[in-house]
Amino acid sequence: MGRARDSGKRSGGPPCSFLLLLLLSCGGGRGKSLLGAAGAQDFHIKVQVYENGDLSPLASAAVEIFGNQSSLASGVTDQDGVAVLGISYRLGTWVLVSATKRGFVTNSVPWRVDRLPLYASVSLYLVPERPATLILYEDIVQILLGSPGARSQPWVQFQRKAARLPRSSTYNQLTSSLTTASTRHQMRGFPAFIGTEPESANGGNTSWVELLPVAAISVHLFSGNGSEVHLSGPVQLSLPLPPESGLTTSSSVPAWRYEPKVGVWIRSGMGLVRRDGQQLYWSFVSPKLGYWAAAIPSSGRGMLSLMSGVDIAGYHTIFLLSILGALTLLVLILLCLLIYYCRRRCLKPRQQHHKLQLSGLSEPKRDQATSTSRLNLISTSHLDSTSTADSDLRTPVLRSAFSSREDFCKSGGRSSFQHSADTLPLRPGSRDEYPLKSARSGDLLESEDSKRGYGTGGKGQQRRRGGRGGVRDPPPSPPPLPPPFKHVIGDSKPPDYLMTQSADPLSRPTSLTQPGQFIFCGSIDHMKEGSYRHAMPTLVIPAHYMRLSSEENQGGQGEEQSESESGSTQVSHAHHFAPQDHAQRQQLLQQGHGYQQGATASSQDQEGKGWGNHGSVTIPVVFNESTMAQLNGELQALTEKKLLELGVKPHPRAWFVSLDGRSNAQVRHSYIDLQAGDKTRSNDASLDSGVDVNEIKVKLGPEERSGKAQLQPSNLTYSKLVFAEEGEQSLSESRTGGGCSPEDSSLTPLLDEGSETCLPMSRRGRSRGDSSRSSTSELRRDSMTSPDEDLNDQSEGGDDQDKKSPWQKREERPLMVFNVK
């Protein structure tokens, strides 16, 4: 028995535990339900249904309450149109109370309280449906309000085959109803416009949205027994819109369908607004008949825009396009800034390089003094010219007729070659003449042409005599430029630099010094190293200071002395015209000598002697202080001579010192005899001379006039050539005597400009008559200024006063003396 009991207890253990767990689960479920229902309270709502027209109560109307998209309670009205429904209500929640009856439009209202009332009553007013006009065609069925073809009326159209008729019904028994609403008062007869999304209606989130209706329609199709006919095909809806709707053509308005099972409007697509004449219509294709509305969600931002007459799609399109345009404009601005920045970065090195190239243009402007440099006047004297026929006709200094320096050199080279070949053999005073050559010092001393010109001086008289015969054969072609002149062709300075340099004759040369130049500057010790770093000092050395080894071997001393005394070699940096002109003139002069030599010798001698290499140039004189003083005096005389040739320009009446703080050791103070002679025109050489250089012009002889008539003036520029005439010694000697002081008489041979016995060499039409000089004058000038005679005088034991040249004595005179008598 005990075992049986124990076994029974053991066997009954599991069923007891199972029952216990079941009871606990049920108790938990009850507790959970009690907790869930703790917030809800039960109470009863009285619903009264009336007809909207005469406010008579409607009996047998179906009443239903919806909350949380589900039916909370339902009932039917009695004869008085009243129904009492009890619900479990949670304070603060929304519920929908609806009433439905056949032949009337379903109506519903939202209801909500925050405090539990003791009694609540809701009244609904149903609007009777309006019978519609039904037109049956073979293919379609139309439902209208009013007569067919009338405007501004709603209509519904569907396919005839889409209607599912009962077996006991025919098309002749079909009836329809069509009710529309477009105003706020009419909208109250339709169910409350509370919408939701399709996902919420199918059991999703319970979010309701308040709608703003534009138009609503209720359309139904009934059979003969009163049952509703369903359709299986699409239905076309067209509703007229009121003018105050604010919609525009092609605007899109959402379509909402009323669902009786949940009591809310469900979104079912999008309708389109179209215009027919002056009337707007909302068109939509629905899947079935029933309650449809064109409404806009009030919570959406698109509602306000659509109500103001702006399409929501167009609004968004314009908004997006505006954003895109702003972004595009921003990108363009950034791109322009990037291009501008890159352009500045790329052009900045070029601008710096351009500034480095044009830095020389600002150098002449640093010295703003009004003093005149005689070296510049000497080197630039070939730029000024006077016409032989008419002295009033002037030519400008700048040759602006040529677009570039290369064109000027090409045209100048051809013309100068032809003119020189024609005029050199025909000059009657060319026996004892030697050209005054001016070129770069390094180029002059190193060029083979210059050596060749001095080397052939021994036979120059024979060639000149042979040239008097008038035999004129075509001259040989000039040889190519020697190596020292090759850099002249490749000059890289721009034309604007030449224009600027020629426009400022007082400017210092800005090119760097070249190898082989003579550099001398009396005040270089007082200057800083950087002051003349970019300036090239210039030294002018007369020809009789230099000796050629070839002259000692080939020519006699008499001819060498006469040749060296007849001219001087000027070494300067010609910065007004391109150096090609000097190189071409050197070749032309040497070519002329070679041509006259070929008239008396064979072609082999002409090639061997005319263009052969000769000895180099030597300067036996030591450039000490006394020599430089004598050289300075000769340069002063040469300067005054050039100033006389440049008589077309008014000479400055004073010398001024540079204002930029630089010292000038060459400043001179002298006077001008303003009472010298009864002459109407003054040809003062300079303020330093103190003499009157007006002299009586000697008439031309018949031989000179005939030779002058044969030569025509040319408009091309050539270097200045000075010729000394042997036959005019008496004329020069007769003018040395005069009523001048010894100092003035020393200037007479240098300033003698009255001789016009030489034929003019055309240099822009300038006469060569004023440039002639007698041999006696040259010998007298050399006797006064030659360093050889100074050395002889020193060896003879002369006193210190005899060692000084007249120019040195003149420098020791009192300063700033005016009108001394």
Curated annotation (Swiss-Prot):
GO terms for cellular component: membrane. InterPro entries: FAM171, FAM171_C, FAM171_N. It is found in: Membrane. Residues 32-317 are extracellular. The chain crosses the membrane at residues 318-338. Residues 339-821 are cytoplasmic. Residues 1-31 form the signal peptide. Residues 800-814 have a biased composition (Basic and acidic residues). It comes from the Eukaryota. The keyword Transport does not apply. Residues 787-799 have a biased composition (Acidic residues). It is a single-pass type I membrane protein. Residues 473-485 have a biased composition (Pro residues). Residues 411-512, 550-613, 727-821 are annotated as: Disordered. Residues 499-512 have a biased composition (Polar residues). Residues 585-599 have a biased composition (Low complexity). Pfam families: FAM171A1-2-B_C, FAM171A1-2-B_N. Glycans are attached at N68, N205, N225. Keywords: Glycoprotein, Membrane, Signal, Transmembrane, Transmembrane helix. Belongs to the FAM171 family. This is Protein FAM171A2.
